[in-house]
Structure formats: C-alpha cells, structure tokens
C-alpha cells in the first residue's frame, strides 16, 4: 500500500466532458487497485473549495478541454500548492493553442504544415487557401469542429460561419496532408513507441474513431522504416521539450508515403492531457513498450509536483 491520497479530477464543463469521465473512471479504478486512496471529483466551479477541504497528497488530472488542459486548473493547483500530474500552467496554455504551439515547435526545428490563423467570419465564400485544407478550432480537442475541405468543393462549408458553430471564432486553416496517421507518446524525457492509427470506416481520426470501441485499429510499433520511426520520436521529444511539457504528452503526425518509402513526416499537434480511456492511444503505446496501465498511472502519480 502506498498510503497516498490521490484526488482524480474528471468531468468538468467542456465539450470533452464525457471523454474526461471515461478517462477519470478508468484511472481512479486502476489507482485504487494499485493501493492508492482515491477520491473521485466531478469538477464544478467549487473545485478549489473541495480540494482545500479534502487536502489530497496528489491531484491526478483526468480533465480534457478548456479549464482542464489550458492552464486554468493547473493555476488553481499551483495556488493551492497541491502536486499534480501532467504539464504545468505555461505548457498547458501554450499547447491548447494550436497555432502558437505550432509556431514554437517549428522554431525548434519540427516540420509542420503550412497554415494561417483566421477569424471564422473572414473565411466567407472564398477559399482562404488552395484546397484541400483543414479548418480547426484553435482551442478544442478530440477533433471537435475539425472540417476537411476537399479539392472539388467550390466554396468553404457554410457551417464554419453559421450560428451552429460552437467552437470559438478563432480558427486555424491548415494545408491538408495526405497519408497515414501516426502518433508518438513521450513519458518524462523518453520518446515511446510510434503508433499507427487506422480509422475503420472514417475519413480521419475524428471523435467517433477515437472513442467508439472498434472504430480504429492501433498498430504499435508502427510498420515504417527505422529512420522514419526515429525521426518521429525525435520530433515528438523536441516538441515536448520546446513547449515545456511534463509527465506524459502525445504528438500527432501525418506520414505521406504514397510516392516513396521515405515519404514526408509532418507534425500536427501535441496533447498534454492525452486520453486514458479503454480505447485510448497512450495506454496502448505503453503496453507495447511493456508498461502496464497500472505502472503508467503509478509513475504519473509519483512524478507529480508543483511548479511543473
């Protein structure tokens, strides 16, 4: 028995609430099995008061989306001086902003796709760049709001400028990179295996293919050339360090090998709060490296600190 009291934060009030609840329950259950004393907290606006009264030894942050991974809850935990998992205030805020995180990664030598930051209302009826391209909300996760504009579309989709859009006015318009979906997790200061994601019946790795059982296949380690494998690991670790991440992060890539085995590798984004659901990538990647889910979570708890 470890004796440590771990508060697992989950749920919250972002668009990724259901994903967070799934992550939180899986993590809390496994940590209990590891011998930790666990309190599950479905986060609301009173979370600071709850934590002051609870006085946990460590907070395991299983929140996703705004407030959970944008530096906000991290700032609360720093103020309360409660050690916590994952990245700190600055890295969390930076990584949540796809455009700014991309600029920092590119400055560190990571290969990125061409893009521009826009207000969604400025897109109008004319293409902001030559199709195909992707429109992404700047501060959303789980592929919420991602729109792929194909070459044969005469105009941008109307939903981007409509009242139905609920992902903020700032969007990133990014050149579409064809090819295979690859991802690489970083644990501490170590790049783990590269994993290929193969969506089953989906155009890309969207919300359903991420969280619906059987909607995607994870191949870890990915079947790619050794030099490409190492290149992806290097870029994942470079982005992790440049953005200032701590604990576990996961970087997503596109690998276009349609015309040669060497192909082209492009970094897409980094996730400082990767999912920990039964269908999530990081647990699968860790398992392929011989690290069980319990060992992964225990390492994260023991790695927790303030001033991250």
Swiss-Prot record:
Record's keyword terms, sorted: ATP-binding, Cell shape, Cell wall biogenesis/degradation, Cytoplasm, Ligase, Magnesium, Manganese, Metal-binding, Nucleotide-binding, Peptidoglycan synthesis
Binding site for ATP: 128-183
Binding site residues for Mg(2+) 1: 252, 269
Enzyme class (EC, first level): ligase
Metal-binding recorded as keyword: yes
This enzyme's EC code(s): 6.3.2.4
Residue numbers binding Mg(2+) 2: 269, 271
Domain ATP-grasp: 102-302
KW Ion transport (keyword) present: no
Subcellular locations according to the entry: Cytoplasm
Cofactor binding, per record: Binds 2 magnesium or manganese ions per subunit.
Biological-process GO terms, alphabetical: cell wall organization; peptidoglycan biosynthetic process; regulation of cell shape
InterPro entries on file: ATP-grasp, ATP_grasp_subdomain_1, D-Ala_lig_Van_CS, D_ala_D_ala, Dala_Dala_lig_C, Dala_Dala_lig_N, PreATP-grasp_dom_sf
Cellular component terms per the entry's GO annotation: cytoplasm
Metabolic or biological pathway, per its Swiss-Prot or TrEMBL entry: Cell wall biogenesis; peptidoglycan biosynthesis
Domain of life the protein comes from: Bacteria
Required cofactor names: Mg(2+); Mn(2+)
Reactions catalysed according to its record: 2 D-alanine + ATP = D-alanyl-D-alanine + ADP + phosphate + H(+)
One term of GO molecular function: metal ion binding
Biological role stated in the UniProt entry: Cell wall formation.
Family (UniProt): Belongs to the D-alanine--D-alanine ligase family.
Protein known as: D-alanine--D-alanine ligase B
Organism for this UniProt entry: Brucella suis biovar 1 (strain 1330)
